[in-house]
Amino acid sequence: EALDIPFHTVSLGGLSDSSHLLGFDRTYQNARHGRLAEIALQSQCTNPIIFFDELDKVSTSGGNDVTNVLIHLTDPESSGSIHDKFLGPIDLSGATLVFAYNDASLVHPVLMNRLRNVETKGYSQSEKLEIAKQHLWPRAVDKSACGDVACDEAVLAEVVRRCDHEEGVRQLQQSVA
């Protein structure tokens, strides 16, 4: 939002079929474009940010189908061009690709070699409290359609304390929501 650039998330956890990313061939009933084409269409710009979450949790039960798509997407020789099975060529050369993973040993070595690793540390309790006050609580109130509902800071602080075993804020977000 701050950069005024479209931001899209692609959840990779458990994904085993590249058709989710690259679409289905037109010969199939209910064929449609893939998630990457959808992002290109929704963005209406050439430089969206695409956040691939849980890279280390891509399913390899059917081989490296999804991983191979990501390897191709990050290949400097392909220049960010992909072929959606439904729509055809898609240019993502201007996109910024961000990948998140917890366990680097579970990421395909060829793909890992193409990524610049930026290690992040978890949030402190005070940072989590600020995130809860400024973002998570207001978002939960908006979703509930209950109007303007206040929450005592001490209550949020207790929720943060109970969720302190995680470095991120995923469980905190679920608890506040």
Place the predicted regions along the sequence by residue.
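Conserved RecA-like P-loop NTPase ATPase core
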Residues: L21, D53, L70, L97-A100, ...
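Short glycine-rich substrate-engagement loop in P-loop NTPases that contacts/grips substrate
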Residues: L12-Q44
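Conserved catalytic/switch belt of AAA+ P-loop NTPases
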Residues: F51-D91, N113
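Helical "lid/switch" subdomain of P-loop NTPase nucleotide-binding domains
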Residues: L3, R32-H33, P48, E54, ...
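AAA+/SF3 P-loop NTPase mechanochemical coupling elements
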Residues: S43-N47, F51, I82-N102, G147-D152
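Conserved C-terminal "switch" segment of AAA+ ATPases
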Residues: Q44, D103-N113, N117-Q174
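Walker A/P-loop
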Residues: E1-L12, L41-Q42, I71
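Short loop/turn elements that form and flank the Walker-type P-loop nucleotide-binding site
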Residues: L3, L22, S43-P48, N64, ...
